Amino acid sequence: MIVNCIDIANNILDKFKSDLEKLKKKKIIPHMAIVKINDDAASDKYVSIKLKKAAELGVKTTLISEGIKTQDDLIKQIHILNNDDSIDGYIIQLPLPKGFDSNVICEHIDVNKDIDGLSSFAISRNLANSNLFHPKPCTANGIIEILKQSNYSIEGKHAVIINRSMIVGKPLIGLFLENNATVTVCHTKTQNLKEMTKTADIVVVAIGKPDFLTKDMVNPNAFVIDAGISVVDGKVVGDAAKDLQEYVKYITPVPNGVGRLTVAMIFKNLMDLVKEKYNERI
């Protein structure tokens, strides 16, 4: 079955809209900043999607894309945003250009303004399943939301993640453990990958290789989350072979799959940051 990720994303955005109407009555309008310094088509597209959705939802936005030439410039800009009370949350658009260390950059992000959930505080609290406030990484948390809104019980399941990035794989470890799953993380050096995926209840693949995950690698009862993105002959495709859609029990589509949830979770995180800032219980 192909999972309807559009409906799941809309459920999250509908909750955002409802909360926003309540905030507006108190004259609170969320303000989000996006810092984009990488001049490439993919980053331009992703930022455009975020700005468009923000405009649709009625969120104030500020795009910062000029005057940042070095890593020190970016760190200074982050500190400005950290101390600007008019900004409720911000995003550092990744990937960064050569000469910028994203790990160093994320060390400077204020957890209370961290929409992407990539600051060191957010990541450590996520892995520790901390009760302290922290935004959860958007793509990883979106994947968990797909499973939950599909009425799929995560508890006790074996989840295999083919990705170890800070955006998908690493935060998913904490989120799956939080939901009482058993987790296996695979990567380019993993041996006997097929043996890992074949026994998995949940397979998350996000490596950017079209048709990488094939029928002989999964069991028919698996829930496949395809978070890979590639362009083939002008079309956006995922990492899962097309015939998996008729083979496995559940699978997310590409496009209109995990990406939809990533965008929706951006605004969920923004709302959570605003609620925390103003101590609003909506």
Curated annotation (Swiss-Prot):
Q: Which Pfam families match?
A: THF_DHG_CYH, THF_DHG_CYH_C
Q: Which Gene3D superfamilies match?
A: Leucine Dehydrogenase, chain A, domain 1, NAD(P)-binding Rossmann-like Domain
Q: Which UniProt keywords apply?
A: Amino-acid biosynthesis, Histidine biosynthesis, Hydrolase, Methionine biosynthesis, Multifunctional enzyme, NADP, One-carbon metabolism, Oxidoreductase, Purine biosynthesis
InterPro entries, alphabetized: Aminoacid_DH-like_N_sf (IPR046346), NAD(P)-bd_dom_sf (IPR036291), THF_DH/CycHdrlase (IPR000672), THF_DH/CycHdrlase_cat_dom (IPR020630), THF_DH/CycHdrlase_NAD-bd_dom (IPR020631)
One GO cellular component this record assigns the protein to is: cytosol
List each coiled-coil range: none
For this chain's UniProt record, which GO biological process terms are given? Answer: L-histidine biosynthetic process; methionine biosynthetic process; purine nucleotide biosynthetic process; tetrahydrofolate interconversion
Q: Which PANTHER family match?
A: C-1-TETRAHYDROFOLATE SYNTHASE, CYTOPLASMIC, C-1-TETRAHYDROFOLATE SYNTHASE, CYTOPLASMIC-RELATED
Xref: HAMAP family? THF_DHG_CYH
Name listed for the protein in its UniProt record: Bifunctional protein FolD
- What organism is the protein native to? Malacoplasma penetrans (strain HF-2) (Mycoplasma penetrans)
